[in-house]
Amino acid sequence: AFWAAGKLYALSAVPSPCVMLDTDFICWKSISNLLDGPDTAAIHREDIMPSIYPDQTAFTKTEGFPLDSFDWTVQPFNTALAYFGNDEFRRYYTDTAIRFMRCSPDADDALTYMVFAEQRLLAMCAEKKYAHAAALSDLPALFGGAQNGYFTHIWGFKQQMRENPKLYEDFCRRCAARLQKDFPEESNCLLY
């Protein structure tokens, strides 16, 4: 049920400051200027959609974890990119997420349980510990290009590319063109 558990275990072993980045997420520019100040940050907040982020009554397979000790109104973070600048908070978050997974060995809804452990708990832990948490962007900026070319997140487009080789080829060509434009010396090494 916990397909991304490896990321959380790895994060638990890496001291802050550190970044956790999904393989379908591209940072085209340095983000160090965006990370000055927060204890933790993620690419954007998520709306609380009950089908993905249900209330605590949905976690019937979780035993011994204090679900009621968290604020369920806090918007989850999308952790395709997550930053941890405060080591004490990083440890608290990873310990909490790993404890939740261990308390849910018979999780019956892989998506709900995993995004709770990885994304919703990040926001809940930050709220509970009064950690300074920041969203680096928002969905309209990511989809509309208003984030100044910092990021590409492939999301569900992966499936469309699997089903349509022309989409895949076009995406690869656009990435190659971007690499040539933004990193001419490095792209010459890669292309030849």
Question: What is the meaning of each model-derived region?
Answer:
Residues 16-28:
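Short beta-strand-to-loop acidic/aromatic patch adjacent to the donor-nucleotide binding site
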Residues 72-162:
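Catalytic core and acceptor-binding pocket of nucleotide-sugar-dependent glycosyltransferases
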Residues 66-72:
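Short, P/G- and charge-enriched loop/turn segments at secondary-structure junctions
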Residues 141-192:
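C-terminal catalytic/acceptor-binding lobe
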Residues 13-18, 36-39:
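Short glycine/proline-enriched coil/turn segments at helix->beta-strand junctions
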Residues 27-64:
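Conserved donor-nucleotide/metal-binding helix-loop-beta segment in metal-dependent transferases, i.e.
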Residues 1-13:
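Active-site-proximal specificity loops/subdomain of glycosyltransferases
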Residues 21-23, 43-45, 84-85:
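Short His-Asn-centered micro-motif
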